[in-house]
């Protein structure tokens, strides 16, 4: 029979990309929004929820994550990317087992649900464990097993990660009524050899898959790639056929005008990760240049080990204010554009055209914020309120496909105490 949200403020996006708020009603039947209006609908709903002083908006989409890395939160703080990754992170990851990934994924999901994230894109190891966690929790996710190769003598047939990735796709793609999608993933240029990248990229294209990569995260990465191959990482991936599939490229901090032209030509989606890039001292993506080129720009937290949380409201805040300060121009990026990055642009990147906005016929991926807070009054500009004033702690409800997964501090699908118990056991073993 469905759920009717009554007397709430609704964040609506017009066809022109502008945002407005409507005070009224929103109805959900099954997994779909079936009513939006100022008058109470005549149809019957099984459940009625009074939402005075609440704002309903699309769920946030975290397009670049390594969710089990919540177990490494704070490891190697203060180091630049390469030293952090090779000296601190990789040695711990070498000791991870599937049970660790299961525990870390569920802990990350608790954090994401409570902070208004309804879908995320993930690349990591033992991804079937993350698939199971997402299925249990009721979230949406694009999950991938990232491929690496440090040995130039390793043949394609000897690389065990490639068949693991393909098997994951064939087994789980579009599972749970499409809530779970499987992507292909290459970690980065500096962690994979060309012959592996070319062969794996061909497999992705043959399967009609989407690709998730790290790309031009630092100037050092670009300089070393040019020294090795005579071209930038962007041009390198283009030459090897990776960009021939729908691609999500995380970071793109150190990209030239020529790189941006390549990204545009291939329809590459770029994921802006402001907190991680700032924390690791990597720099800041040329947001305005990318958007002016017509590139779809989404938003991500990166893993909690380099952030150190999965809070998309914090990402929106930095994505809003940092370009303006860096360029000495308060019009460099608008709050509405940042809100798009965290919602509709993220949906586009994940291949989910049926979500990302509140509209009749769209999937009911909805979050509610409590506006009855000192820091949220008055409100003269809702996008700016959300990107520059709201906190993740203002989230009081998270719904995915019409099912409430989190409400007023209570998780509906996961046992919070069990998740913490299992996560503590993993941390104790890893860091004993």
Please place each PLM-identified region on the residue numbering.
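Metal-coordinating catalytic core of metallo-dependent amide/deamination hydrolases
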Residues: 129-253, 258
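His/Asp/Glu-enriched, well-ordered alpha-helical/loop segment
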Residues: 239-246, 288-373, 389-391
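Alpha-helical scaffold segments that flank or form the walls of functional sites
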Residues: 73-139, 162-175, 423-432
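Divalent metal-coordination and catalytic microenvironments
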Residues: 8, 26, 31, 53, ...
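A conserved active-site cap/scaffold subdomain adjacent to cofactor or substrate pockets
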Residues: 258, 264-295, 300-301
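Active-site gating loops and adjacent loop-to-helix segments of metal-dependent hydrolytic enzymes
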Residues: 71-103, 110, 140-162, 219-246, ...
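Active-site microenvironment of metallo-dependent hydrolases
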Residues: 1-24, 29, 39, 342-432
